[in-house]
Amino acid sequence: MPDSIPSLPDWLSRGMADLFPAGDPSDADQALAARLAQAEKEGRPLRVKLGIDPTGSNIHLGHSILFRKLRAFQDGGHTAVLIIGDFTARIGDPTGKSATRVQLSKEQVAANASTYLRQLGQDQPKETALLDFETPGRLEVRYNSEWLEGMDLPAVIGLLGTGTVGQMLAKDDFSKRYGSGTPIALHEFLYPLLQGYDSVAVNADVELGGTDQKFNVAMGRDLQRHFNKGTQFGLLLPILVGLDGVQKMSKSLGNVVGLEEDPLSMYSKLEKVGDAAIDDYVTLLTDLDLASLPDNPREKQKAMALAVTASRHGIEAAQKAQSDAATLVGGSGDAGADVPEASLAEVNFPAKAFYLFSAVGICASSSEARRQIKGGAARLEGEKITDPNQEFTSAAELEGKVLQLGKKTFRRLVA
């Protein structure tokens, strides 16, 4: 009988948006499955690359879907190669940018990299860490300055010779900027080549990336072929939409859930994710079986929020957050009518947080409101308010939301 056609394990294919090599997706699936089988036969783990440029200081759940897939490879017995782009971060990835990025200093990049590793779980037990830092042979942390900083001019010119201007202008971001007359600095053309060379340097078998990284991941394959290093597979994952359910999760859009948020804040935010986005959140952020979850969107939200919060803080903290959130906003919303209402009719907008608490009668004065907020007693929809000067623009922004002071004082805001 002929050999059965290999297929990808569920942990690998879950949430996958695209897989290189290009062409018939089933062919790519079978090719990667065959490479997995061959690696197992040889007793050799695959080397799975994920590169991150430490251009900021915080990781949110939108970033975490790539790290979750990298962790899945680790748990499957393979080697995660986490590349800290300490060199490329000084150039800045032009992907998705309409203008040249501001270049960062070595000191800024080093500080951000240290923060990233801490958030990924460098000092945490592997049960709640995004990556497994404990099991020998499961993780390599590499800095691309190792091989890029020492490149001499002939090597750089040689690298530039592997690409063309036409190839670079085919990249959507460059094409738009060129068409609109927005300047493109020459060093920006280097970025995809440098990121691609990372795959050569670490002998990657698989590279992970978001769907917005397709050009850069393909460049890695091209450079591996050029340097006779084999060819990596590119496994692309979707871009997670933010809490608004519309735009991608982004700190600048204010629709994020940070990895380091406290359990109650994390759970409360996730419990309000829009119906259209719930299935993606379940698939990309949890190991829950979507088919076994209730059809009721509200129950599905709660299951997802509990699972995500538990993955970061442990099940006991997550269950407590779920219980506390139910107390704050009446659980599923059915008991929400028991929360006293407070009118926004007399509130002058834009309104700062300290003024809002006093204007609706939760605090006796603005000074008391400032003190309570600074003391950590104030929340809106379960999310802690830490800045007394946080500004709210209109009554519509607050309509129907629950304002809380301490453990016993709640007001549902009505316009």
Curated annotation (Swiss-Prot):
Any matching Pfam family: SYY_C-terminal
Single biological process term from Gene Ontology: tyrosyl-tRNA aminoacylation
Keyword entries, A-Z: Aminoacyl-tRNA synthetase, ATP-binding, Cytoplasm, Ligase, Nucleotide-binding, Protein biosynthesis, RNA-binding
Catalysed transformations (reactions): tRNA(Tyr) + L-tyrosine + ATP = L-tyrosyl-tRNA(Tyr) + AMP + diphosphate + H(+)
Motif ('HIGH' region): 54-63
Cellular component GO terms, alphabetical: cytosol
Primary residence: cytoplasm
EC class: ligase
Protein biosynthesis recorded as keyword: yes
Protein's cellular compartments: Cytoplasm
EC numbers for this chain: 6.1.1.1
Annotated motif 'KMSKS' region, positions: 248-252
Molecular functions per Gene Ontology: ATP binding; RNA binding; tyrosine-tRNA ligase activity
Residues binding ATP, per UniProt: K251
Domain (S4 RNA-binding): residue spans on this chain: 351-414
Record's keyword annotation contains Transmembrane helix: no
Similarity comment: Belongs to the class-I aminoacyl-tRNA synthetase family. TyrS type 2 subfamily.
Annotated HAMAP family: Tyr_tRNA_synth_type2 (MF_02007)
Described function: Catalyzes the attachment of tyrosine to tRNA(Tyr) in a two-step reaction: tyrosine is first activated by ATP to form Tyr-AMP and then transferred to the acceptor end of tRNA(Tyr).
Quaternary structure (record): Homodimer.
The protein's name: Tyrosine--tRNA ligase
Taxonomic lineage from the root: Bacteria, Bacillati, Cyanobacteriota, Cyanophyceae, Synechococcales
